[in-house]
Amino acid sequence: MTDLLSRAHADALDAADPLRSLRDAFVFPQHGDRDQTYLVGNSLGLQPRAARAMVDEVLDQWGTLGVEGHFTGPTQWLTYHQLVRDALARVVGAQPGEVVAMNTLSVNLHLMMASFYRPTHERGAILIEAGAFPSDRHAVESQLRLRGLDPATHLIEVEADEPNGTLSMAAIADAIAQHGPRLALVLWPGIQYRTGQAFDLAEIVRLARAQGAAVGCDLAHAVGNIPLTLHDDGVDFAVWCNYKYLNAGPGAVGGCFVHERHANSDLPRIAGWWGHEQQTRFRMDPQFVPSPGAEGWQLSNPPVLALAPLRASLTLFDQAGMAALRAKSERLTGHLEQLIRARVPQVLQIVTPAEPMHRGCQLSLRVAGGRAQGRSLFEHLHAAGVLGDWREPDVIRIAPVPLYNRFSDLHTFVGQVEAWAAA
């Protein structure tokens, strides 16, 4: 083993890491007398230490002010959702008026499709990737059926064309060109949840808009993971969850982006009173006057207690900056790839693309010997306090998150793989 693959080298990298102090801003689950080796921030991010104080602040305001907390106090609930707006916009590469924290991902996807999926007799198809996250597929199929359309004829899936189960841009481009005259909407992920493949959203937008289709994105595995430029890319809408890389807690409030070209449009929408312009909302007029931008798609008043942990996490993103986080992420995941290829190549096959521009922090791994061996390794890791996650039928996902993971965590993971293989 070369020095570059030694734990001593990893410890040196950790000592030189300019972001190392951010780890102390999170609460780690324990395994015996030590922190878990937590490599599953792609499923649920860790709790920011500041989250408890920010939740307590809301509880204290509720206890002392009651309903008046909507309009008075240190953080008025009427505008609490706007406390996370600017930081969210920086994370996704948007203008502040293009983003809002509301609802959850699947709810927001339905709201966006109600506005942006406008099928006609000639143009009614929706294009997605084969193997999309099930909730996305459920949403798409139900939207088609709500319009009286058959998913068998109006849902187009782009099949993986690479040996590792990923998609080439050529395959995506060919599908958009082939079905272009029929396409009403292209719904695409920033990162595919099972394989960890990242996509060139700007190019997908260019191809789809050239065919006259709208473009929406599911950014569940991209937001807070890779730099995004939604405004410049020209995406019509995007939705995401905030409980993975944005560390806002289980079942956290979601996020939504609507490009500013739609800010004052007359697009049909499913409306609610919190989407009404703020200045006249409490007049209780019967006519709906939408707030400009993404806030005009809000339905009900924001879940303030759920927004508080997101606010705590976004403070850390502003402190670090997405560029620095991405630079560390590329080094972490690159080091993990090196370790796997050097020490356990006979055990683990890397599904995720090798090029940093085509992945985020996650590596999706298949275990030699098939599903039974994969489950055996996964359970061994869990028992040893090394947490990744499992996605059927046969993938272990490992995600070194730059906010709180260390290079030495990757040695712990690979060391446990070696121990399992030797048993």
Swiss-Prot record:
Gene Ontology CC entries for this record: cytoplasm
Enzyme class: hydrolase
Reaction it catalyzes: L-kynurenine + H2O = anthranilate + L-alanine + H(+); 3-hydroxy-L-kynurenine + H2O = 3-hydroxyanthranilate + L-alanine + H(+)
Keyword Hydrolase among UniProt keywords: yes
NCBIfam families: kynureninase
Family note: Belongs to the kynureninase family.
This protein's name: Kynureninase
Originating species: Xanthomonas oryzae pv. oryzae (strain KACC10331 / KXO85)
